[in-house]
Amino acid sequence: MLDFLRVTGLFFVTAVAEIVGCYLPWLVLTQGRSAWLLVPAAASLAVFAWLLTLHPSAAGRTYAAYGGVYVVVALLWLWRVDGVVPTRWDLVGGAICLAGMAIIALQPRAAS
C-alpha cells in the first residue's frame, strides 16, 4: 500500500509538471503574456517526461494509470487556478478515473 501511495504522489507531481508546461504557453498564446514563459514551460515539460521514467511499470501501463490522476489534478487546477468550481459531474468523472488508476496500479503482479 505504501508503494501505491508513493506512485500516486509521483503521478500527482507529474501531472502538475505537465499542466504547468502546457498552461504557460497557453498564457503566452491567449493572454499575450511574455514569451519568456516558454522557458519554464519547456523545463516543466522536461521534468514531466523525466518523472514518467521513475515508475517501475511498463511505459504503456504507467501512462494509462497516470491518466486517471491527471484528470483529477486538472480538475483541481480548474478550481484553484481558473477559479471554476467543479460540478458534481466533474467530481464523479474524476472519481471514476481514480478508480481506473487504482485498478491498473494495484493489479496483481506476476512473479518474475
From Swiss-Prot:
Keyword Cell membrane assigned: yes
Keywords of the record: Cell inner membrane, Cell membrane, Membrane, Transmembrane, Transmembrane helix
Location(s), subcellular: Cell inner membrane
SUPFAM superfamilies according to UniProt: Multidrug resistance efflux transporter EmrE
Gene Ontology CC terms: plasma membrane
Membrane-protein topology: Multi-pass membrane protein
InterPro entries reported for this sequence: UPF0060
Membrane-spanning ranges: 9-29, 34-54, 65-85, 91-111
Source domain of life: Bacteria
Keyword Transmembrane helix (UniProt): yes
Similarity comment: Belongs to the UPF0060 family.
Name listed for the protein in its UniProt record: UPF0060 membrane protein Mpe_A1656
